[in-house]
Amino acid sequence: MKSCKATKIEAVLTMDSKGQILLPKELRERAGLKAGDRLVAIAGCDENEEVCCLILVKAELVDEEMRSIIAPMLKGVVG
């Protein structure tokens, strides 16, 4: 599995009153996402254990290697 070497803000999302968010079409297409695909939300926490960020990962890609892939990405985004 290749790891992402660059991270950037892809979109600003808004949650509706039902708690739903919409991923822009261009982002869905680039990520190869389609209706019915399952995503895992991984929460990043600050020093007070407050959730400060969420990462969405395709469910079929989640395994024991995810921590080693996600950790460097978080460092680039949050410090």
Curated annotation (Swiss-Prot):
UniProt xrefs under InterPro entries: SpoVT-AbrB_dom, SpoVT-AbrB_sf
SUPFAM superfamilies reported in the protein's UniProt record: AbrB/MazE/MraZ-like (SSF89447)
Protein name: Uncharacterized protein AF_0476
Keywords linked to the UniProt accession: DNA-binding
Database matches in Pfam families: MazE_antitoxin (PF04014)
Domain of life: Archaea
Domain SpoVT-AbrB: 10-60
Bilayer-crossing regions: none
Keyword DNA-binding: yes
Molecular function terms, GO-annotated: DNA binding
